[in-house]
């Protein structure tokens, strides 16, 4: 559990640093990370089911990402987080929006082309 917390902190720090690199978007990677942080245990297969707080964060993030630049930025942040988490279960990541009852216009994966997100 301590290792998972260290990893979450590392990802959060990376997202804060990477956030200003791209941006006409209002969303920062720090913001995105904050919304999906409750999902880390589930995505790393330490939780058997998607936590309610995770789905609340996914839903809130989806509601915030209204413009194409915001959706592309959220996508970039999620792809970056997926690549930074070596223990992530990619099938769980890809299925997370559906598990939370949210439709997003792209698949969460380590290789998603976020420039194609509209």
From Swiss-Prot:
Q: Which SMART domains match?
A: AAI
User: Which organism is the protein's source?
Assistant: Brassica oleracea var. italica (Broccoli)
- List the InterPro entries: Bifun_inhib/LTP/seed_sf, Bifunc_inhib/LTP/seed_store, Plant_nsLTP
Q: Which UniProt keywords apply?
A: Disulfide bond, Lipid-binding, Signal, Transport
| Name of a matching Pfam family | Tryp_alpha_amyl
Q: What is this protein called?
A: Non-specific lipid-transfer protein D
In terms of superkingdom, the source organism counts as Eukaryota
Q: List the disulfide bonds.
A: 29-77, 39-54, 55-100, 75-114
